[in-house]
């Protein structure tokens, strides 16, 4: 499953990207780093279930494919918590994380 690591940005792209972005991104990444058939099935399933995460469909014939999707209001109200790294601060409950073997402190 190491070949899927190149496709992680696909899951991090905001839902407001135009419709034509997803197939172009997939084709360019497949041309660059060809995943194994098993990982291609997993990647296809992840992209198809992407519609479950957003309030709009993946593709619709009711609008132009070059128009951007409406940004979900839940993210606007949450202060773009998914876009920034403040969710790590919320999850850890700390302002900084200390890594002793590196003698480094990461401030969130």
Curated annotation (Swiss-Prot):
Cellular localization per UniProt: Membrane
Protein name, UniProt field: Uncharacterized protein C652.01
Pfam families in UniProt: BC10 (PF06726)
Family membership noted in the UniProt record: To N.crassa NCU05373.1.
Main localization, broad class: membrane
InterPro entries reported for this sequence: BCALP
Organism: Schizosaccharomyces pombe (strain 972 / ATCC 24843)
Presence of keyword Acyltransferase: no
Bilayer-spanning residue ranges: 7-27
Topology of the protein relative to the lipid bilayer: Single-pass membrane protein
One cellular component term from this protein's GO annotations in UniProt: membrane
Keywords: Membrane, Transmembrane, Transmembrane helix
């Amino acid at each position: 499953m190491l070949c899927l690591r190149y496709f992680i940005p696909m899951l991090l792209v905001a839902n407001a990207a135009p419709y034509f972005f997803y197939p172009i991104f997939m084709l360019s990444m497949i041309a660059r780093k060809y995943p194994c058939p098993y990982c291609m099935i997993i990647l296809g399933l992840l992209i198809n279930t992407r519609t479950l995460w957003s309030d709009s469909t993946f593709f619709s014939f009711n609008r132009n494919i070059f128009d951007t999707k409406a940004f979900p209001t839940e993210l606007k109200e949450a202060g773009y918590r998914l876009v920034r790294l403040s969710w790590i601060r919320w999850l850890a409950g700390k302002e900084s994380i200390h890594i002793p073997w590196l003698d480094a402190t990461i401030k969130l």
